[in-house]
């Protein structure tokens, strides 16, 4: 079984409060990945309340972003359109709101699917269970979710498509990819510099 996890492809991370040119550049690649993916798709949405600046994250990153039901919180229109087209084609789409970098709920849902697949196919089929992550930001939410999924599913193949991710800076993107490699997360489509 193969799952695609689209991390935080929201307006504030693309062209809003925390947007970057690198984030804008991956949008067409993420759309193509969604359109061509042959499995279930999960997505996460960074979700904060009006009290964001009073939280630990808000004190350490004092930029209001992804405030629930604002335009910045919404998914990028091109990404949302690709997800909708997949759903219209009867592909299962599962969304998770999260108030922190990683989503334990995402990990739990994928762990349940993994256990079900193992009960049907046996332990020898571990390598057939793959999770592919794309999205923003490589050095914050992508790495957090990748490591969380590795903790929930140590025998599953977890892959990050580097061409469909962007970090806060290009250097932090590269550093996050190296950190994930060290934790036995596979990196595909990495551009050598």
Description of each model-found segment:
Residues 150:
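Gly/Ala-rich phosphate-binding loop of Rossmann-like dinucleotide-binding domains
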Residues 1-95, 116, 123-126, 155-159, ...:
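Active-site acidic carboxylates
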Residues 100-144, 166-192:
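Conserved N-terminal glycine/acidic-rich loop preference
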Residues 28-31, 35, 111, 143, ...:
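Amphipathic, non-transmembrane alpha-helical secondary structure
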């Amino acid at each position: 079984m193969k799952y695609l996890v689209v991390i935080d492809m929201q307006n504030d991370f693309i062209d809003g409060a925390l947007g970057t040119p690198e984030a804008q550049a991956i949008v067409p690649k993420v759309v193509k990945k969604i359109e061509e993916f042959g499995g279930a798709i999960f997505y996460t949405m960074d979700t904060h309340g009006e009290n964001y600046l009073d939280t630990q994250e808000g004190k350490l990153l004092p930029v209001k972003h992804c405030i629930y039901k604002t335009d910045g919180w919404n998914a990028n229109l091109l990404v949302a359109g690709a997800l909708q087209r997949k759903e219209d084609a009867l592909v299962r789409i599962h969304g998770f709101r999260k108030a922190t970098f990683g989503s334990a709920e995402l990990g739990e849902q994928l762990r349940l699917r993994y256990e079900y697949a193992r009960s049907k196919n046996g332990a020898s089929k571990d390598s057939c269970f793959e999770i592919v992550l794309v999205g923003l930001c490589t050095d914050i939410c992508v790495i957090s979710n990748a490591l969380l999924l590795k903790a929930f599913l140590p025998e599953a193949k977890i892959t990050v498509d580097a061409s469909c991710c962007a970090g806060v800076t290009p250097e932090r993107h590269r550093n996050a990819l190296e950190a994930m490699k060290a934790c036995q997360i596979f990196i595909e489509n990495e551009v050598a510099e």
